[in-house]
Amino acid sequence: MTPSNDLFELIKSMTREEKIHFRVHTKGLTKAASKNYLALFDAIESKTDYDEASIRKKMGMVGKGGKFAVLKNYLYNSLLTHVTNYHCATKEAYQAREYLRMANVLFDKQLPAQASKYVKKAKSIAEKNHRYLDLIGIYFQEELIYKNSPDIKKYSQTLDKHFNQELAVITQYLNTRQYIYLDCQLLNTIRTTDNLSHPDSQEKIQAILQHPLLLDENMAMSLYAQIYYNTINGIGYHILADDNKSYSYRKQLIDVMASQMIITAGYIGNYIGSLHNLTVTEI
């Protein structure tokens, strides 16, 4: 049976900062355990391709398949935990989910007041970053806390508000998913077409661009829907060699991203790419 290279792929995917985070926290373990895990980590990290036989030899674990498998599995789970914790501390999207998880635990332990504090933290982050799917769970947990509150009057006053809040974010999420599907359709057409200038290919692109959601910008009900609306049209009309329309949509995409400050929420790469596409169209 071919040895799994999952651990190798995970280590190779790690950034310098993630590796430092792992090393610092691993050194806090007992000396023997820390030495084993770091030795295996270093042995795998030094490889260009995964060669389990040479790694076992380097670790002095030739013929100890079961023990080596346990060490690999422990290191993999440990790395995944460290990477997750690192991103929970550095990325707001992860923090929102972590706060919601904490709120769920506190609510299950019948500590609604404490749970509410973490729901508010999660909600603030998710709303700021337009995390619609996260907000569905956050609003639901918030409604549960109010529902089980002894303050019946307060629950009665907020019942409609919570329902409408949940309904609005579900609608935004579904609307965004429709635009994502259209984006996937366009990408699939591009990937499976040898000659995009061929009349048949142009007809396929045109058919996608004639979808009702792509004909009216007011149909895009969320920030990400607006981004997809302009992205799809910008690319589509570029393929159809309609540079005026392509430029218009790409310029609008830049304006949307900049006005919503999405470039500060982990989208700097997308923003720079959009600026490049706009420049190419303009030239």
Model-derived features: positions:
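TPR repeat positional signature
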Residues: 92, 99, 118, 134-135, ...
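Helix-turn-helix repeat elements of alpha-solenoid scaffolds
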Residues: 73-77, 110-120, 153-163, 194-213, ...
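Flexible helix-coil transition and linker loops at the boundaries of alpha-helical arrays
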Residues: 86-90, 125-129, 170-174, 211-223, ...
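Residues that mark the junctions of alpha-helical repeat units in TPR/alpha-solenoid scaffolds
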Residues: 88, 95, 135, 219-226, ...
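Tandem amphipathic alpha-helical repeat scaffolds
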Residues: 102-108, 140-149, 181-198, 227-242, ...
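Short helix-adjacent coil turns
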Residues: 17, 63, 106-117, 126-133, ...
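Short, charge-rich amphipathic alpha-helical segments embedded
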Residues: 122-151, 257, 262-266
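Intrinsically disordered, low-complexity protein-interaction/activation regions
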Residues: 1-111, 147
